[in-house]
Design a protein with these regions (language model features):
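Solvent-exposed flexible segments
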Residues: 144, 151, 185, 197-212
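Short, internal active-site loops enriched in acidic
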Residues: 68-69, 110-111, 205-208, 262-267
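Solvent-exposed, glycine/polar-rich loop segments of beta-barrel outer-membrane systems
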Residues: 1, 76-85, 117-124, 154-175, ...
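Outer membrane beta-barrel translocator domains of Type V secretion systems
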Residues: 1-194, 316-340
C-alpha cells in the first residue's frame, strides 16, 4: 500500500478490499437462470398429442436428469469476473390433466466449484438446491409455459492477497436464496402435411432476484473483511425460434424427436455486482467493491434429442450455450423419462 507506483498501490488496495467477493453473487444469479432454462427444455416436450383421442387422462410422468455446466465472466482490470463449473441432478414429475393442460414439479441439487482472479484471487464452492413448479397450456397452435423456481445456496469463498514479498489468506462462508419466474409463448407452424416437423417462433420473458447474505472472513485477523449483502435483480426478454422434428422410430413405432433453438436475448436491470466491505480492523470505514460488467445482449443456442426406449421410456439429451460480450456459458443434461 505504500508503493511509489500509483497503479501498484491502487491494485494493492483493490486486493485488500476484496476485488473478487462479487463472484459469489454474480455466479448465484447466473446459476438460477441456467436452472430455469433446464426446466424450460423439459416442458417443451410435455403435453398430449392433439391428433389422438385422449380418454385416459390424467396421465402421469416422471423424469430424472444429470446436469453439468461451465460459465465464465471475464475480469476487467480490478473488477473481478468468475469461473463456475457445476454438476448435479434433477427429479421431476408432471401430469397431463387435460388435452390442453400439463402441470408439474421438479427438485434439483447442484454442486459447483468457483474461482475468481483480479487484484486478489479466490476459490470456493457454490452449492444450490432448487424447487420448481411449472405449467403448460396448449390451445391449437398456441402454447403458454410458466415456470416458478425458488432456490437456496450454500457458498464458501477463500481469498489470497499478495502484497510485495508476502501474502495472506482468508476464508468466508455464507448462504443465500433466489427466486425466478419464466414465461414462454410459442406458435406452431407445421412444415409438412404429417405435422412431423414444426417451426415455433417464440417469445420468452424471465426475471430473477437473488440475495447472498453478508459474512465475516476469518484467518487473517484484522486484515479480514466484513462483506456486505449481495443483491441482484435481472429481467430478460428473448425472441427466437425452435425447430422440432421426428427423425426415426423404434420397433414399437415410437419416434425420436430432434430439437434446435436459436434466441436473441436482452437483459434489463442489474449488470454488475457491487458490495460494501469493511476491514475488520477498521470497521468505521466502508468501501464499495464492484465486479466486472457482463454484456446485456446475448445469442442463445440449444439442441436436444429424445430417443424412445421400449413402450414407455425416453432417453433425452440437451445442450445450451449463452454467448455475450465478456461472458459465456455452456451446459448440458442427459436423462430418462417414464410414462406411467
Amino acid at each position: 500500500l505504500t508503493s511509489s507506483n500509483p497503479s501498484e498501490a491502487k491494485r494493492a488496495m483493490a486486493a485488500v478490499s476484496g476485488s473478487t467477493v462479487n463472484a459469489l453473487g454474480t455466479a448465484q444469479r447466473d446459476a438460477l437462470r441456467d436452472q430455469m432454462g433446464w426446466i424450460r427444455n423439459r416442458t417443451t416436450l410435455m403435453g398430449v398429442n392433439p391428433a389422438y383421442v385422449n380418454d385416459d387422462l390424467p396421465r402421469f410422468h416422471m423424469w430424472m436428469e444429470g446436469t453439468g455446466s461451465y460459465a465464465q465472466l471475464d475480469t476487467r482490470g480490478d473488477e473481478s469476473g468468475y469461473r463456475l463449473t457445476t454438476w448435479g441432478g434433477t427429479v421431476g414429475m408432471d401430469a397431463d390433466l387435460s388435452d390442453r393442460v400439463t402441470v408439474g414439479a421438479a427438485f434439483t441439487a447442484s454442486y459447483g466449484d468457483l474461482t475468481a482472479s483480479a487484484a486478489d484471487s479466490a476459490d470456493g464452492h457454490l452449492d444450490s438446491y432448487y424447487a420448481s413448479l411449472f405449467g403448460r397450456y396448449q390451445n391449437k397452435r398456441w402454447a403458454h409455459t410458466l415456470i416458478l423456481t425458488g432456490g437456496w445456496n450454500d457458498a464458501k469463498l477463500n481469498r489470497t492477497v499478495n502484497y510485495g514479498e508476502g501474502s495472506y489468506s482468508t476464508q468466508g462462508s455464507t448462504s443465500g436464496w433466489g427466486l425466478g419466474a419464466m414465461y414462454e409463448l410459442t406458435y406452431d407452424i407445421y412444415l409438412d402435411e404429417n405435422r412431423s416437423s414444426v417451426l415455433q417462433p417464440l417469445f420468452n420473458a424471465s426475471v430473477v432476484t437473488t440475495r447472498m447474505d453478508g459474512y465475516e472472513e476469518t484467518g487473517a485477523g484484522n486484515a479480514g473483511l466484513n462483506v456486505g449483502r449481495q443483491d441482484w435483480t435481472t429481467g430478460t426478454v428473448a425472441l427466437g425460434g425452435r425447430w422440432m422434428g421426428l427423425i426415426g422410430s423404434n420397433i414399437f413405432g415410437r419416434e425420436a424427436l430432434g430439437e434446435i433453438r436459436v434466441n436473441a436475448a436482452q437483459d434489463l436491470g442489474d449488470r454488475r455486482g457491487e458490495t460494501n466491505v469493511t476491514l475488520l480492523g477498521n470497521p468505521g470505514f466502508t468501501q464499495s467493491v464492484r465486479g466486472a460488467k457482463a454484456g446485456t445482449t446475448a445469442l442463445q443456442l440449444g439442441a436436444g434429442l429424445s430417443v424412445p426406449v421400449g413402450t414407455k421410456g425416453t432417453v433425452f439429451v440437451n445442450g445450451n450455450a449463452d454467448i455475450r460480450d465478456g461472458s459465456s456459458s455452456v451446459n448440458g443434461s442427459v436423462g430418462y423419462r417414464y410414462d406411467f
